[in-house]
Amino acid sequence: MEIAPGMLIAHMHGDWNAEMRALIASQMKAQVPTLNAAGPWGIINHMHDTLVYGPDIYAQTRADYANRPAGSRLQAVAFVIAPHVEGASLLRSRFESLLDGVIASRVFADSQSAKEWIKVQLQLLDASGPNPGN
C-alpha cells in the first residue's frame, strides 16, 4: 500500500480469495480518514499477477465502492492491468465496466498513466464538482 498526494495505491499480488480481499479492503479503509481530511482523492488498484478471481470478488468490489460512506471524498478508481497479467486479455473488460454508474473508473496498462488520470479527475472536480459515476 502506498500513499501519494490525493491517491491511495494498492498493490494486488498473488491469487485472490475472499479472505485476501477482505484484508486488503480493511488496510485500505484504515487510510480513508487521512485521505478524506486532505481533500478529494482516488484509488489505484495495481493488479500484478492475475485477474482470475471468483465472481464473488468482482461483486464484492463493486458493492464496496457503491456503499462507500456518504462523507467519502473518493472520486475516482483506476485499475492497472499490464498485458502480462494472467487473464488480462480475457478479463480486462470486466474491470472496464465493473464500476459503471458507481464512480468514475478506468483501466490502464501502466501505473504512470493511472496516476495522471487520477490527477486529471481531481482537477476536473475542482472545476465542476463531484462526479458520481462514469
Language-model region placement:
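Amphipathic, Lys/Arg-enriched alpha-helical "gate/interface" segment within cytosolic domains
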Residues: 1-134
